[in-house]
């Protein structure tokens, strides 16, 4: 099983009709706040007779802080996208597939809006703060810095880049960035991650010296994908699926006709479990197809009642 792909075209289709109008109004507000700060700083510079270097430094700092404060004051704007993003993943976190979001505003900025941990001089991708294509539906554990007894992680302000590390530090920069973190909206990225029978997320790349392996490995760490309760939940699902399939196999071989009602009940239980754990699979394919092409390869199962 791989990380699930989210089609950004589906996000765009669901945007509110007045989305761009709302964003334009927000930027007018933000630009107004930074303009006010600039006027105040320049007035103070005249009063205190600053040189150009001090003026430039103070302006940059004041505008940066005013912009950040103004952007954060409008967090309700990207917060309104939460339900739309959630609908594309059946309420599951786009990174770890958890439904335990426990967050009032589970919208992550893939390119962090306030700062970049790996590049101290980066102001953050503030110009993407209200860009819908930069939004990802994320649980608190994937998006916030956390440490437990066995793992640490949380994306927070991290946005590492593969060498050469050329970040776009303004809206005018045009560097081709190569992010380390896997993006669930990238159809190639989702195949770089898989899950083993112990419930652990791990690279789906054999060559551990390749950049692709590094991307998957660091994504597991920074998204906190092996947070112990989440990993154990995956393992429990694997155990239950294996048990149900094993029981259906045994009853089918013994006497299918005699056991068909029990078999049907077990198949219904299996269907319900997959529907809860992997709803996107059953939303487009019947149970047997989902088992044969996704669940069986993932769990290494043999099934004698399909075909």
Report each predicted region and the residues it spans.
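C-terminal, charged low-complexity interaction regions
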Residues: 203-307
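Extended, low-complexity, charged intrinsically disordered regions
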Residues: 1-6
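Short, charged surface segments at domain edges that flank catalytic/cofactor-binding sites
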Residues: 17-19, 24-92, 116-133
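Histidine-centered nuclease catalytic patch
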Residues: 98-137, 146-167
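Long, low-complexity, intrinsically disordered segments enriched in glycines and aromatic residues
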Residues: 159, 164-209
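Primarily a LysM-type cell-wall glycan-binding module
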Residues: 11-12
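Short, well-ordered loop/turn elements at secondary-structure boundaries
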Residues: 88-90, 101, 131-133, 176, ...
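Short cysteine-rich loop/turn motifs with clustered Cys
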Residues: 80-106, 139-142
């Amino acid at each position: 099983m791989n990380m699930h792909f989210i089609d950004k075209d589906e996000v765009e289709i669901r945007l509110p009709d007045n989305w761009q109008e709302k964003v334009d109004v927000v930027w007018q507000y933000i630009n107004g706040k930074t303009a006010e700060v600039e006027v105040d700083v320049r007035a103070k510079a005249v009063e205190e007779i600053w040189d150009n270097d001090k003026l430039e430094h103070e302006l940059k700092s004041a505008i940066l802080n005013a912009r950040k404060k103004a952007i954060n004051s409008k967090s309700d704007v990207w917060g309104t996208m939460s339900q739309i993003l959630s609908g594309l993943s059946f309420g599951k976190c786009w990174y770890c597939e958890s439904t335990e979001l426990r967050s009032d505003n589970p919208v992550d900025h893939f390119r962090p809006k306030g700062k970049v941990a790996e590049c101290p001089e980066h102001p953050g991708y503030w110009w993407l703060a209200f860009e819908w294509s930069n939004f990802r539906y994320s649980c608190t554990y994937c998006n916030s810095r956390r440490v437990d007894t066995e793992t640490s992680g949380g994306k927070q302000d991290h946005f590492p880049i593969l060498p050469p590390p050329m970040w776009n530090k303004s809206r005018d920069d045009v560097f081709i960035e190569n992010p380390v973190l896997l993006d669930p909206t990238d159809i190639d990225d989702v195949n770089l991650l898989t899950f083993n029978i112990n419930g652990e997320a791990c690279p789906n790349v054999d060559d551990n010296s390749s950049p692709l392996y590094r991307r998957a490995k660091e994504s597991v760490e920074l998204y906190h994908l092996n947070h112990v309760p989440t990993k154990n939940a995956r393992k429990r699902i694997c155990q239950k699926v294996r048990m149900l399939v094993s029981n259906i196999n045994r009853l089918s071989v013994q006497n299918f006709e005699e056991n068909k009602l029990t078999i049907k009940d077990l198949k219904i239980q299996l269907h319900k479990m997959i529907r809860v754990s992997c709803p996107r699979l059953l939303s487009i394919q019947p149970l047997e197809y989902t088992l044969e092409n996704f669940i069986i390869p993932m769990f290494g199962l043999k099934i004698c009642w399909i075909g």
